């Protein structure tokens, strides 16, 4: 029966998705490979990286003897992912476009295309993750529309699928999948969930997939790649074409000629004595916890707060300065994957779990407090370094990824508390990373 199952596999032109398609083929499924083009630009040598990736994906399909399709979501990526990315940066937040891309593009646009246009019984990707469903259970799933209300009727989905961490904990990518919908997850297979990266490479080497095995692992912004972010945001521009803006052939309603973000020069100021240490091109380019490159200073200084009103970036010496540490945050309405929200959290209004706000960082024990609007307060058992507005707090209970929420408010830093400024109020939802620095955006 499994031989009749049609699985559409997303191919990126990399080794992980190639091996995912190979493993599906070995299971006897009818496999179709699809390459998504979501960004269109030339690299420094004038070569379009997306075209090279597309060629590599096509070659994978030739080797595996499976059909190949290409789809473009350039317009959707711009509207749903990149525009939000720019807006978040302008507000002084630290966005994660990889999480947004999975939510809006890979597990929405592509997912619907695979099911509605290609007749897929299931969709697959090369992510290192697992779900609580076996393959045959995935094929039996029916479409269930997500509820419009705040909380899902608990009888609506009797056996919700859970998102589980991969066997290879170092490569686990559930962090990036924490906003994926229940409906998409129910129809998804992750062939690499039980494998290590080394074993995946071994499979590729043994099956004539050398052209993807030799490629460097993709890093940086989803579909855009690893770039100098300051140069990318401030210098790259697009032009008016025939009276309307075209981005890779897709019309975009924006100013005819522009830079992504305009430079806004400001000062680096020491949080300890208010000394001006140097200047920068824009306060929004900096994330709490990162090292600030200040001309003329050899010793390291780190970003601890940002003042969007004045355009100043407050910095502190030492990588472990107390101004870098906080133990309290509030998210927007949390996207819960299996239960919305977890029964224990509804019952007790509080729940112990773990969270992380960066991929591959150690999980942090915390206590969640549920608010009536679906947002949560997150109290870390121990203060953590580098919390920033705009990041996603991703929650875990054992091996299960529960979901995530965007960080919109932060509690005072350990430095503020130590100085006796023990203000219990938390920063409003603004483009600042500490209380009281900015007016509301």
Swiss-Prot record:
ATP binds at residues 10-17, 36, 126. One of its GO terms (biological process) is tRNA wobble position uridine thiolation. Keywords: ATP-binding, Disulfide bond, Mitochondrion, Nucleotide-binding, RNA-binding, Transferase, tRNA processing, tRNA-binding. The record marks 127, 291, 391 as: Interaction with tRNA. The keyword 4Fe-4S does not apply. It catalyses: 5-taurinomethyluridine(34) in tRNA + S-sulfanyl-L-cysteinyl-[protein] + AH2 + ATP = 5-taurinomethyl-2-thiouridine(34) in tRNA + L-cysteinyl-[protein] + A + AMP + diphosphate + H(+). Coiled coil: none annotated. Residues 96-98 are annotated as: Interaction with target base in tRNA. Disulfide bonds join 101-222. InterPro entries: MnmA-like (IPR004506), MnmA-like_C (IPR046885), MnmA-like_central (IPR046884), MnmA-like_central_sf (IPR023382), Rossmann-like_a/b/a_fold (IPR014729). GO terms for cellular component: mitochondrion. Residues 421-441 are annotated as: Disordered. Pfam families: tRNA_Me_trans, tRNA_Me_trans_C, tRNA_Me_trans_M. It is found in: Mitochondrion. Catalyzes the 2-thiolation of uridine at the wobble position (U34) of mitochondrial tRNA(Lys), tRNA(Glu) and tRNA(Gln). Required for the formation of 5-taurinomethyl-2-thiouridine (tm5s2U) of mitochondrial tRNA(Lys), tRNA(Glu), and tRNA(Gln) at the wobble position. ATP is required to activate the C2 atom of the wobble base. Belongs to the MnmA/TRMU family. During the reaction, ATP is used to activate the C2 atom of U34 by adenylation. After this, the persulfide sulfur on the catalytic cysteine is transferred to the C2 atom of the wobble base (U34) of mitochondrial tRNA(Lys), tRNA(Glu) and tRNA(Gln). The reaction probably involves hydrogen sulfide that is generated from the persulfide intermediate and that acts as a nucleophile towards the activated C2 atom on U34. Subsequently, a transient disulfide bond is formed between the two active site cysteine residues. HAMAP family: tRNA_thiouridyl_MnmA. This is Mitochondrial tRNA-specific 2-thiouridylase 1. It comes from Rattus norvegicus. The gene is Trmu.
């Amino acid at each position: 029966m499994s031989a009749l199952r049609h699985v559409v596999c997303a191919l990126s032109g990399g080794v992980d998705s190639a091996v995912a398609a190979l493993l599906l083929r070995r299971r006897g499924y009818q496999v179709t490979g699809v390459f998504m083009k979501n960004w269109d630009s030339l690299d420094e040598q004038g070569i379009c990286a997306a075209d090279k990736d597309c060629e590599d994906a096509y070659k994978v399909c030739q080797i595996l003897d499976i059909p190949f399709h290409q789809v473009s979501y350039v317009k959707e990526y711009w509207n749903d992912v990149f525009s939000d990315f720019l807006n978040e940066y302008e507000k002084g937040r630290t966005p994660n476009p990889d999480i947004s891309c999975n939510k809006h593009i890979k597990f929405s646009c592509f997912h619907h295309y695979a099911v509605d246009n290609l007749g897929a019984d299931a969709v697959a990707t090369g992510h290192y993750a697992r779900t609580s469903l076996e393959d045959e259970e995935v094929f039996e799933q029916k479409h269930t529309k997500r509820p419009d209300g705040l909380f899902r009727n608990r009888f609506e989905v009797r056996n919700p699928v859970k998102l589980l961490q991969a066997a290879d904990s170092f490569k686990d990518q559930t962090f990036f999948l924490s906003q994926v919908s229940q409906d998409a997850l129910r129809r998804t297979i992750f062939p690499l969930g039980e494998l290590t990266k080394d074993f995946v490479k071994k499979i590729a080497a043994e099956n004539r997939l050398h052209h993807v095995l030799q490629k460097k692992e993709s890093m940086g912004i989803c579909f855009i790649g690893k770039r100098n972010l300051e140069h990318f945001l401030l210098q790259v521009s697009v032009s008016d074409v025939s009276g309307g803006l075209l981005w890779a052939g897709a019309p975009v309603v924006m100013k005819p000629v522009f830079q992504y973000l305009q430079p806004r020069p400001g000062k680096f100021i020491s949080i300890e004595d208010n000394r001006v240490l140097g200047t920068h091109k824009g306060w929004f380019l900096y994330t709490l916890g990162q090292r600030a490159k200040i001309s003329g200073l050899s010793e390291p200084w780190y970003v601890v707060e940002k003042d969007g009103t004045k355009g100043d970036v407050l910095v502190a010496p030492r990588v472990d300065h107390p101004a870098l540490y906080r133990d309290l945050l509030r998210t927007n309405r949390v996207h819960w994957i299996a239960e919305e929200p977890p029964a224990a959290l509804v019952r007790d209004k509080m729940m112990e779990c773990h969270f992380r706000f960066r991929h591959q960082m150690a999980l942090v024990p915390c206590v969640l407090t549920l608010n009536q609007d679906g947002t949560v307060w997150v109290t870390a058992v121990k203060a953590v370094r580098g919390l920033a507005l705009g990041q996603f707090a991703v929650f875990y209970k054992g091996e299960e990824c529960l979901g995530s929420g965007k960080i919109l408010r932060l509690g005072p830093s350990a430095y503020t508390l130590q100085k006796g400024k023990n203000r219990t109020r938390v920063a409003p939802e603004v483009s600042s990373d500490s209380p009281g620095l900015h007016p509301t955006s």
